[in-house]
Amino acid sequence: MAKKVQAYVKLQVAAGMANPSPPVGPALGQQGVNIMEFCKAFNAKTDSIEKGLPIPVVITVYADRSFTFVTKTPPAAVLLKKAAGIKSGAGKPNKDKVGKISRAQLQEIAQTKAADMTGADIEAMTRSIEGTARSMGLVVED
């Protein structure tokens, strides 16, 4: 018989840098999960990813206080900022342009995000990432 699910906890945690301080500690503490056990498991799973990159994680907490977790790919906006070499997006994306990004870079990001995106093909996913780039004030070059 399957374990009874008590809760799903969604967090964004920096890769390889999970520790019991907020947001991890309070979110898992109120579910009764062993926080250090999660931190060690998460850090071990994300040690191959660039340190500090925010990684979305969905933690399934069971009634017996055990847990499993699934890591996702970093948010598209974070990958776009990294590729364009900018600190933040534009405050007024229609008026201000903060950087440029090539179509090849967009396709590379779409390939990275392919596991988490529900697109029909890589072109559709690339267009989705392109929309995110434009909304951040990035100019897409061919």
Curated annotation (Swiss-Prot):
PROSITE patterns: RIBOSOMAL_L11. Coiled coil: none annotated. GO terms for biological process: translation. Keywords: Methylation, Ribonucleoprotein, Ribosomal protein, RNA-binding, rRNA-binding. It holds the Pfam family Ribosomal_L11. One of its GO terms (cellular component) is cytosolic large ribosomal subunit. The keyword Ribonucleoprotein applies. InterPro entries: Ribosomal_uL11, Ribosomal_uL11_bac-typ, Ribosomal_uL11_C, Ribosomal_uL11_C_sf, Ribosomal_uL11_CS, Ribosomal_uL11_N, Ribosomal_uL11_N_sf. SUPFAM superfamilies: Ribosomal L11/L12e N-terminal domain, Ribosomal protein L11, C-terminal domain. The keyword Ribonucleoprotein applies. CDD domains: Ribosomal_L11. One or more lysine residues are methylated. GO terms for molecular function: large ribosomal subunit rRNA binding; structural constituent of ribosome. Part of the ribosomal stalk of the 50S ribosomal subunit. Interacts with L10 and the large rRNA to form the base of the stalk. L10 forms an elongated spine to which L12 dimers bind in a sequential fashion forming a multimeric L10(L12)X complex. Forms part of the ribosomal stalk which helps the ribosome interact with GTP-bound translation factors. PANTHER family: 60S RIBOSOMAL PROTEIN L12, LARGE RIBOSOMAL SUBUNIT PROTEIN UL11M. Belongs to the universal ribosomal protein uL11 family. This is Large ribosomal subunit protein uL11. It comes from Shigella boydii serotype 4 (strain Sb227). The lineage of its organism: Bacteria, Pseudomonadati, Pseudomonadota, Gammaproteobacteria, Enterobacterales.
